[in-house]
């Protein structure tokens, strides 16, 4: 398989490894991106890939709570400038209020619902598009619930570039729930605890760490012990309750939550545009297209 410059660029962004190392890794793995990441890690060249795609889309996240119901949503725009527009800000609040009150199962169902003004959600968004002059997209939302004995923690970072909604069970301490949400915004854990990590993911990591230790020339008899130690660090990186609490690194998040008399029921973290990559036009093609368009 031909290794392209774009593939090398993507691998560099995912791993931080050098260009020649990335090219070699892709060549050795026949262009398989995930295997190339493992190859670099086994050689000790790259750290564990965060697997978070480059964030390129614009827009905002927003959180709305009402009693025991909470909602987090993401509304995309084409530019950051429009996301700061008053009309955009009004639209996202109107959508949040509607979604929380009507609880559609998904975006498709939401778009077909009728708002208080008598218009379909899709029609309401299209009217905003006509006024603002940019494509706007209701990308996703999630509705969560709690009981009177629980607390929501809502946190918007950088005005909504990142949004986190937590549910602290068995405690009504909203400040504590928000502190956990702030930690999640900063550290971006994948799971609540180790029990949530699949056996397949743990085994894959164990294999990579084993090969890494062997490539370092460590004696086989101590490799297993080394791998278990490194697996502990792996869990700390991806599991919320195992992480050092951002506001007090001397304690784990688990200890902080327990000190408040509660347990963490769940969390949702949205970062604007994650998993969306803007199309990168070739500059020469762009110039050619402009020239052709002027004829």
From Swiss-Prot:
Gene3D superfamilies: 1.10.286.20, DNA helicase RuvA subunit, C-terminal domain, Elongation factor Ts, dimerisation domain
GO cellular component annotations of the record: cytoplasm
Location of the region described as Involved in Mg(2+) ion dislocation from EF-Tu in the Swiss-Prot/TrEMBL record: 79-82
GO molecular function, one term: translation elongation factor activity
Intrachain disulfide bonds: none
Entry's localization field: Cytoplasm
Pfam families: EF_TS (PF00889)
CDD domains, per database record: UBA_EF-Ts (cd14275)
Keyword annotations of the record: Cytoplasm, Elongation factor, Protein biosynthesis
InterPro entries in the record: EF-Ts_dimer_sf, Transl_elong_EFTs/EF1B, Transl_elong_EFTs/EF1B_dimer, Transl_elong_Ts_CS, UBA-like_sf
Entry similarity comment: Belongs to the EF-Ts family.
Function: Associates with the EF-Tu.GDP complex and induces the exchange of GDP to GTP. It remains bound to the aminoacyl-tRNA.EF-Tu.GTP complex up to the GTP hydrolysis stage on the ribosome.
HAMAP family (alphabetical): EF_Ts
Protein name according to UniProt: Elongation factor Ts
Native organism: Bacillus anthracis
Gene (name only): tsf
């Amino acid at each position: 398989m031909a290794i392209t410059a774009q593939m090398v660029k993507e691998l560099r962004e995912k791993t931080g490894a050098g260009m020649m190392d990335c090219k070699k890794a892709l060549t050795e793995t026949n262009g398989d991106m995930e295997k190339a990441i493992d190859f670099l890690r086994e050689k000790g060249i790259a750290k564990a890939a965060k697997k978070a795609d480059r964030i390129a889309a614009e827009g905002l996240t927003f959180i709305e709570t009402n009693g025991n119901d909470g909602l987090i949503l993401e509304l995309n725009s084409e530019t950051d400038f429009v996301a700061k527009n008053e009309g955009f800000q009004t639209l996202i609040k109107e959508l949040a209020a509607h979604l929380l009150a009507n609880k559609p199962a998904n975006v498709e169902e939401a778009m077909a619902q009728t708002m208080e003004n008598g218009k379909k959600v899709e029609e309401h968004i299209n009217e905003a598009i006509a006024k603002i002059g940019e494509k706007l997209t209701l990308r996703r939302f999630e509705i969560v619930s709690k009981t009177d004995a629980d607390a929501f923690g809502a946190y918007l970072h950088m005005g909504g570039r990142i949004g986190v909604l937590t549910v602290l069970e068995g405690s009504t301490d909203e400040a504590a729930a928000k502190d956990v949400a702030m930690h999640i915004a900063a550290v971006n854990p994948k799971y609540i605890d180790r029990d949530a990590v699949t056996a397949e993911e743990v085994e894959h990591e164990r294999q990579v760490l084993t090969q890494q230790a062997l490539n370092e020339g460590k004696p086989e008899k101590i490799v297993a012990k080394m791998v278990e130690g490194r697996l502990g660090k792996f869990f700390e990186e991806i599991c919320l309750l195992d992480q050092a609490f951002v506001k007090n690194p001397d304690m784990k998040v688990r200890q902080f939550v327990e000190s408040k008399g509660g347990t963490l029921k769940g969390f949702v973290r949205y970062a604007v545009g994650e998993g969306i990559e803007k199309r990168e036009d070739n500059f020469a093609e762009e110039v050619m297209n402009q020239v052709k368009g002027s004829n």
